[in-house]
């Protein structure tokens, strides 16, 4: 995952803070999220190597007799100097709303390259209803922090390899995989390898640990010298109802640095 990061890459197209449409389209409930289907992320600050996930609802699209909607998204990303760093071709797609209603969930994914300079980046998008030709422009900013050791691109998946996204709220009896990357670590001068310790601990809604001891992993080998990051993850079974916090702490023993990421998760009863 971290061997091919470009300056910045858009993985999908989608909008940001809701602004009024020129016609009947609006974008509502816009927020940064922990992964594609995760809960709301409270901040807009990201380290190089991280992924900006944006979720929203599109309201007012023309719905066909079979529940189909057709729309186009255009996107541009600029850096702190207002220089365009990514501008893909506009994408037109058809989605379906078989359960009815007037809202279509949408998402955006933007990867902050490991070489991206710190500063405020701006994401500009335009969503157009192909049936009515009504459009809505949107602008969203996010801050790229200076390059440093950390945990990046935290998300949940249904599979161990991270190919099928999952929500961070699950039904008791189900299981998700929490995926993330360790980035920008130092290397031991003798071995040319990182020396990173990862600690994983779960806490309940009252802030109490759910088990007595944390999961501890150490990474000292197997990372090619041209890599600035490596993936990691673990399985998380939902065994009881409640709200919980997954605390992941990574320590770079070579650089004597540590980084902590907290991911809220929840389990609900089946049925």
Regions found by a protein language model. Give the residues of each.
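Intrinsically disordered, low-complexity terminal regions enriched in Ser/Thr/Pro/Gly
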Residues: 18-271
